[in-house]
Amino acid sequence: MSLQLPSRLPLRLPQSRNGRIALALSVVYLVWGSTYLAVHVALGSFPPLLMSGLRNLFAGIGLFVFAARRDPVWPSAAEIRNAGLVGTMLVGLSSGMLAYGMRTVGTGTAAVMVATVPLFATVIAAVAGRKIGRGEWFAVGLGLVGIAILSHGGGATGSASGSLAILCGALFWAGGAHLAGRLKLPSDLFLSTSLQIGLGGAMSTVVAWVSGERMAEVHFLPVLAFLYLMLIGTMAAYVAYGYLIRHTSPIIASSCMYVNPVVAVALGALLLGEPVTSSTVIATVVILASVGLSFWFDYRRRGMA
């Protein structure tokens, strides 16, 4: 399925498939890497789970309105159910567990832990019956080494229960990505994405409200950060991620989880004055090398299929 935008928008996407994949990867790498900083600011007025739920719920509604105006092929009941299931995994459970864990785990440490998603994606692919080559296992292992270096260099702290919750969130994300690549979802990318994040966000919002989460005093910068998370970090990035899920392997689509911590650390250094140690530099090289290897081995596997 080709990704099309209304002709009235002054935006031209790359014409080649590889160009669109590169654009989508750039979005999920840079935007999701910046969301940790935005979350840090938004928490000044929003409690974690309510922020996650509202951000996805509103983004889902906005994207649904946009998709509906394009006169898409409307989904069947089964496709809506599948979109809700994937959204529950990617948004409701994954983001919910991340929000729960971040009550006791720092933002930088959380970003590093979320980078375990490709490991879970590889394990899930193996359990599902795909033969995983030694090269792919090596690439994942190398990425985890880089994550460990980055975590050590950043002085990671947090409770064991919070860390476990975040790792469970990473597992749910990998599971959702796996399901998204195998279930029949709405054919229109925008409509499919809107249903996934909207339904997942609705679930998170209900859970947050029932658990007693309420907004604190409203301030300008937290609201601005929330709008960034909703419009860019959710609407734009999830469309890009959905495109990757449909046109690449789950492991490649999840490779952003390796790069996002590097972006988060860089933004923290530039905007928050956080120190960049030699461990951070070494980890950056190792992590990016692991991503390159993931691309290479996946390309070879697809070429020999």
Pin down the residues of each PLM region:
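Specific transmembrane alpha-helical segments of multi-pass solute transporters/efflux pumps
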Residues: 31, 35-36, 64-110, 114, ...
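Hydrophobic transmembrane alpha-helices of multi-pass small-molecule transport proteins
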Residues: 63, 86, 116, 132-152, ...
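Glycine-/small-residue-enriched transmembrane alpha-helix faces in small-molecule transporters
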Residues: 2-53, 96, 100, 155-182, ...
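Juxtamembrane helix-entry segments on the extracytoplasmic side of multipass membrane proteins
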Residues: 17-22, 44-53, 75-81, 137, ...
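C-terminal-most transmembrane helix of multi-pass membrane proteins
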Residues: 2-14, 56-57, 152, 222-224, ...
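Juxtamembrane helix-loop-helix junctions in multi-pass membrane proteins
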Residues: 30-61, 76, 106-108, 175-200, ...
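Helix-helix packing/entry segments at the starts of transmembrane helices
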Residues: 52-54, 95, 109-116, 179-202, ...
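Transmembrane alpha-helical segments that form core, pore/gating elements
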Residues: 59-63, 120-123, 127, 140, ...
